[in-house]
Each structure stands twice: as C-alpha cells, then as structure tokens.
Amino acid sequence: CAASIYGANLVTNRADSPHLSAKNITGEMYFACAEIDPYAPKETIDQLQDQLQQTDIKYRLEWYPGAEHGFAFPDRGEIYHKASAERHWERLHALLDRNLSI
C-alpha cells in the first residue's frame, strides 16, 4: 500500500511522470488532496484520477475543502486544518491497518 499526502509532483510533463506508471501499481493507494494547493492544483489531480480510473487499482482519492498544502501537520501554524487533518489521519491509519501485518 502507499499514500500520498497532497499529491505534489505525481503528474508532470516528463516522459517518466509517476502517473504514467499507475498501471503497474498492485497495492491499495490513498491520496489526500488539499483544495488550495499550488503544488498539486485540481487540474493535476484530475489528470491523476483519470489515469487511476483506467486501472484496476483499489484507491481512494479525497479532496479536503478549505485545506491548504500542509494541512495535516499542527506545526504548520495557520495552514493546519484540524478537521481535515483528523479525517486524513483516520483514513491513513485505516489503509495501513488493512494492508500491513504488524
């Protein structure tokens, strides 16, 4: 399994852009996307989701309305978005619990 907090640089103009390898993913994926994120704008995340939908990957891509890049970490000051952070950490822990034998 794998998770992406914010989704930065998952879609680029390069020939080796990560989203182009989505068909090779075998594990469950989780993507947490901030609504306000200059590093992963909606258009970029939409391209990622389009690519993911063409595969059989089990994934969850969630938007966090009103949240900015860095929302999940309390030490980010005003950027920290408590409600979104709590939901994000619940989703991430659930992903890890489902997929990792500890």
PLM features: what roles do these ranges have?
Residues 19-23, 48-49, 78-81:
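Short, hinge-like loop/turn segments at secondary-structure boundaries
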Residues 6, 33-35:
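N-terminal Rossmann-fold cofactor-binding loop
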Residues 10-20:
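Alpha-helical scaffolding within the catalytic cores
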Residues 53-102:
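C-terminal catalytic histidine-bearing segment of alpha/beta-hydrolase fold enzymes
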Residues 12, 36-40:
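Acidic catalytic loop of the alpha/beta-hydrolase fold
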Residues 1-9:
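A conserved short beta-strand
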Residues 16-18, 41-51:
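Short alpha-helix in the alpha/beta-hydrolase fold that links the catalytic acid
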Residues 25, 31-33:
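Short beta-strand/loop motif that positions the catalytic acidic residue
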